[in-house]
């Protein structure tokens, strides 16, 4: 029986890895403890598994929402660990003098390709006048004014990603109102 199950989970894993290659999403494995153990044994990339849930009930007749509800706690714990790790990275960069929190400096570094990781408080929007030639960003409170970009944060995010960095959105309760953006620089 175990060899059949392992072969079955090996086939499942090949499909999972094919999907993972396209989307790079974290994986939560749901099932009973025995099947989870078999899957982990044959899985090509066990590091992709962020959580396992063996206490979900009625999986045979459960709806998709039932399964989502059963993994929610594990996903929230994973997110919390990512946020704590992000705060650690921010502190480490601050100590190494590789952190910028002033929006003008963040913009300039992002534009120049120096941004490694941009941390942004969810929902943070700021209108500003951007001059790419001078590499300046001037905050304004009138998003409708001529020459004003209503979402300068979106522009910063685009520059960071375009230059090979990444953007991480942080919960509002973790990143404060007075420091809604932080950029860890490459150098």
Briefly describe each language-model feature range.
Residues 1-187:
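Terminal alpha-helical anchor/extension segments at protein ends
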């Amino acid at each position: 029986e175990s060899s059949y199950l392992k072969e079955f989970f090996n086939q499942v894993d090949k499909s999972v890895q094919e999907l993972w290659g396209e989307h790079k999403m974290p994986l939560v494995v749901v099932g009973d403890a025995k099947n989870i153990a078999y899957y982990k044994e044959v899985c090509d990339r066990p590091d992709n598994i962020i959580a396992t849930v063996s206490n979900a009930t009625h999986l045979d007749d459960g709806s998709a929402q039932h399964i989502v509800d059963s993994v929610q706690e594990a996903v929230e714990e994973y997110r919390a660990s990512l946020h704590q790790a992000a705060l650690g990275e921010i502190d480490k960069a601050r100590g190494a003098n590789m952190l910028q929190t002033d929006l003008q400096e963040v913009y300039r570094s992002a534009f120049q390709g120096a941004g490694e990781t941009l941390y942004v408080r969810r929902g943070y929007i700021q209108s500003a006048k951007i001059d790419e030639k001078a590499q300046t960003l001037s905050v304004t409170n009138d998003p409708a004014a001529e020459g004003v970009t209503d979402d300068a944060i979106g522009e910063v995010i685009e520059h960071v990603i375009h230059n090979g960095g990444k953007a991480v959105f942080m919960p509002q309760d973790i990143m404060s109102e007075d420091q809604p953006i932080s950029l860890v620089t490459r150098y």
